[in-house]
Amino acid sequence: MTNSNSITPVMQQYVTLKQQYKEYLLFYRLGDFYELFFDDAIKTSKILNIVLTKKGNVPMCGVPFHSSETYLNKLVKLGYKIAICEQLETSEEARKRGYKSLVKRDVVRIVTPGTIVEDSLLEAKESNYLACIVMIKDSCAIAWLELSTGLFCYHMTYISKLDSDLLRIGPKELLVADDLLEIEAVYSIIKKYRFSITQYSSSFFDENRAYNTLCNVYGVSTLKGLGDLKGVEISVCGSLLEYVIATQKGSLPKLGFPKAYVQSDFMFIDAAALRNLELFSTQSGELEGSLIASIDFTVTASGGRLLKRCLSAPLASADAINRRLSVVEFFVNNQNLYKSVRQVLRGIADIERILTRVKIARCSPKDLYSLKLTLEKTCELVELLCKFNIDIISEFCLRLGRYEDLICILNNSLLQNSVSSVKDGGFINPECDAQLSEYIYIQECSNQLIQELRDRYRNITNIQSLKILYNNILGYYVEVSSNHLIDDKNFIHRQSLANNVRYTTTELKELESKIISAKDASISLEIKIFGQLCSDVIKYADKITITAHTIAEIDMLTSFAELAVQYSYSKPIIDDSYEFNIKKGKHPVVERNGKFIANDINLSSEQRVHLITGPNMAGKSTFLRQNALIGILAHIGSFVPAEYAHIGVIDKVFSRVGASDNIVCGYSTFMVEMIETAAVINQATERSFVILDEIGRGTGTYDGLSIAWSVIEQIHNVNKSRAIFATHYHELSKLDKYLKHIKCFCMKVEEWDGKVVFLHEIIPGASDKSYGIHVAKLAGFPQSVVNRAEYLMDKLKTNEDLLT
């Protein structure tokens, strides 16, 4: 950076601010542009593909203020953090302090991937979490906050479950201590993710410091009356808040006290299962082809976010699940109603996020107008639902609430074409304020008022050629020819020219002042009225929050009804038994691709482990995933793709299916397989649901068979989980002879005229063939290679020497 003694006052101001925000790209406001200088300019110009110029020896680039959010969006998505420096006064205000006074500037907020609240920077149906992990000795806690909605949770966890926690939460930014990343077990997990990482020294996470932050934020002297936070939980929640306060420069919305995420209330889906089952994205990272893409019929942003939260943490209480199922069933049985409800929902804005922007004084007139329209739509929802005298629906009506008074205030004050920024005015109804009406009248009628005054002066002076003109030096002035001098003390001489004489009057000066200042005055008054409207909205904040949550829930449940009706899903029976009985079940994603063969499964207590043999390509993996997905769908309160489903509550879902066959963190494929299998046998309970595919295939035959055999015994005898185990080891089919709760099944195959047909049906019994050579033929192996493989297989069957 250039020597500070050789640069202009403006650049000195920039350098001083940049020293305070070294880790951020500094967007420095100069007039209608945000400018970047030095290394920031070089880096940003490359990222944004904008022109890099120089002023002297100083590299610089800039983006227009009015379109800055487009550029911010790109930078934030790439994980950059930006300090926004604004002008805190006008140049006129600066000159009042002295002719050469520099306009005051300061950083007013810091934009980071986990702390954004602007709609233009957020994905509508994606939560935008900032997370924090703190470890003290053997205790580990994680907290996460979505600033745009106020959702704030914390959870005690273990390093072994950290991968699952991070995958479930999906933060955009992670706050950690430097020394935490020095722990290999933690670093190996975190480095797999693409979120932005913000590091501080361990002193930032000090418990006493965090305690004081929490007390200051919630305005209390002790935390005892607010919750059961202790030790590392205090550290993780307080540190997270301190970081948010720093990024928002003190402009923090009113947040509820952090809520404990109680794992026992929710189904635990381990990281391998979240990935292998493709709940949120395919193995290639695409949304299309994932479970959520197949079941998301929500029509509001908040409903979409709720669906994703529910899918990442399904319910684990039969009562809670059945409450949702009852609502879905009600809507399925009243299709005209749910279609009408969904039509109303389509006109609803994201008031959860709008409310946060109102609280931190970062909302726009358009936001308030959208809020007004949504509250009107809420009244329509209540009218639709209150016709049904059913408890679960009446509860929705109560929680939706009514807002006649607030709607009236907003209706009377806001113009329909409300704009996205307050800086230019034009969004407040002039009829709501007499002073504003006068300002607007002056602006709209300035030409007419000048002409009326001109006509009056012509009558007074008897000079019909008299004109009222304007220039930047004199402002408005009266002009007559030199032959028609005005002899009236009310007309003050200003200027004499060769052919004309110019005058002014007190009345003309006052009118000029009104015309020139009316625009600024009207904008200032509109901003003041807008501030009062925001204060009026904040009075309803708690009620609006409940309404927003209710809208999201109604949207999600009516989307489940749409899913059930469109694809003929059935209502599952959910209870506290250990049943898993599915008739004519289908894979909710794969069935959309065309004809799909439905299959049954009954993992009752008498046959809680199913061992499935059969060739590759026959559909074993699809069948395994299908049943895990049916179980998960049932636990979020959705109907399921089956004719019948009876499912006892599942506490955990584990999956070791081939989709993880890649090298992660330097581990071999086989090591990854063993790690995922170890998680199953170490954590699964008798309420868990386990799917295991081809355990042991990544090593030698005897090693693999021995591992697979012992894993099945462990799950059968110790874990006692409901499990489906697919294998190519036909020897394992002997296990049903001495493990009484195992039943063998295989994939149905027909052979005809030398051809093999995979029927994708599950039937009782064990397969005695792998059909591997046939699959190789289907894959396009040359016939010579296929023939050679068949010849060698025949020799192996008769124990002949392959080299003879």
Curated annotation (Swiss-Prot):
Gene name tied to this protein: mutS
SUPFAM superfamilies, A to Z: DNA repair protein MutS, domain I, DNA repair protein MutS, domain II, DNA repair protein MutS, domain III, P-loop containing nucleoside triphosphate hydrolases
Residues binding ATP, per UniProt: 614-621
Protein name, UniProt field: DNA mismatch repair protein MutS
InterPro entries noted in UniProt: DNA_mismatch_repair_MutS (IPR005748), DNA_mismatch_repair_MutS-lik_N (IPR007695), DNA_mismatch_repair_MutS/MSH (IPR017261), DNA_mismatch_repair_MutS_C (IPR000432), DNA_mismatch_repair_MutS_clamp (IPR007861), DNA_mismatch_repair_MutS_core (IPR007696), DNA_mismatch_repair_MutS_N (IPR016151), DNA_mismatch_repair_MutS_sf (IPR036187)
Biological function: This protein is involved in the repair of mismatches in DNA. It is possible that it carries out the mismatch recognition step. This protein has a weak ATPase activity.
Single GO term (MF): mismatched DNA binding
Top-rank taxon, per record: Bacteria
GO biological process entries: mismatch repair
PROSITE patterns: DNA_MISMATCH_REPAIR_2
Keywords, comma-separated and alphabetical: ATP-binding, DNA damage, DNA repair, DNA-binding, Nucleotide-binding
Native species: Ehrlichia ruminantium (strain Welgevonden)
Gene3D superfamilies: 1.10.1420.10, DNA repair protein MutS, domain I, MutS, connector domain, P-loop containing nucleotide triphosphate hydrolases
Similarity section: Belongs to the DNA mismatch repair MutS family.
